[in-house]
């Protein structure tokens, strides 16, 4: 492990919508907990120094959301996210974190860290901002178009990660669809349902509907990247609207204000659980290294939590344990290996 006292995280210094100040504050907060942070960005704008437990690696070029991610990653060898991914690949850091372009982060991580054996497409997985037992949701943006076999792979990847990192024993896995019946949904969902229902080594509970996402009907919920991204942002927006409405109602009259005052501790805890910053970000599953895609609008606490998520994933050997769990059982091996020869993803 690169860091003598704990994990080392390579943090992309560009891309945070709240600017260099929030990124620097988040890096300092994570470093104060013993996480070594290497920030790739412009030293003067970041205003960080080695004494704070953070090392700044000069980088002055970035890849934005307006850029075509894959060509940009290949062409801009000195872009911050490319340098950070290379830092992990070369063994100087244990994990990559970026709050910049999702596409660029995925491309840089995939090129630099490489996919696990048998994995066709890495998937972005996020712990949903819901109270109670953790619910892992994937894919939330890496793969807009998928086939049944990809959904099956995502199911095994998500189940392995949920058990290894989130500590959920024998996680229940569901497919997001428009109805609970096995025949409901697009053809790839119907086909994936049939494959998973017949597979061993996974606790498949069938289809789940959108209303079931926050209710714990499954510990791992699988869908394509387009649907997942829309659903995740809808949940984030709804949570923000609900907490805002509660605050507004509590100020509507003196009696409501008194009730709001009495409820403040409980509502504060609920708000923290629903806050997207609390999850840290989405982790790219299926790679031979750790890569976390943080929310672009994250504040300092969200940035620190993304670094913490990456460091925790290193501490518990998420990659090794996920790979080991995937190797257990013929169903898991078959689900991953049967798609390797698919020329469409070569």
Locations of regions flagged by a protein language model:
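Glycine-rich phosphate/nucleotide-binding loop
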Residues: 110-137, 217-221, 225-336, 342-346
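Glycine-rich phosphate/diphosphate-binding loop of Rossmann-like nucleotide-binding domains
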Residues: 21, 38-44, 144-210, 219, ...
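Short beta-strand segments
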Residues: 12, 40-41, 57, 98-100, ...
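N-terminal phosphate-binding or glycine-rich loops at protein starts, especially the Walker A/P-loop
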Residues: 1-46
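Short glycine-rich anion-binding loops that position phosphate/pyrophosphate groups of nucleotides
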Residues: 14-15, 61-62, 101-104, 111, ...
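Short glycine/serine/threonine-rich phosphate/pyrophosphate-binding segments
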Residues: 17-23, 77-91, 95-109, 120-125, ...
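Phosphate/nucleotide-donor binding subsite
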Residues: 50-93
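Short, glycine-rich nucleotide/cofactor-binding loops
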Residues: 9-21, 73, 142-152, 293-300
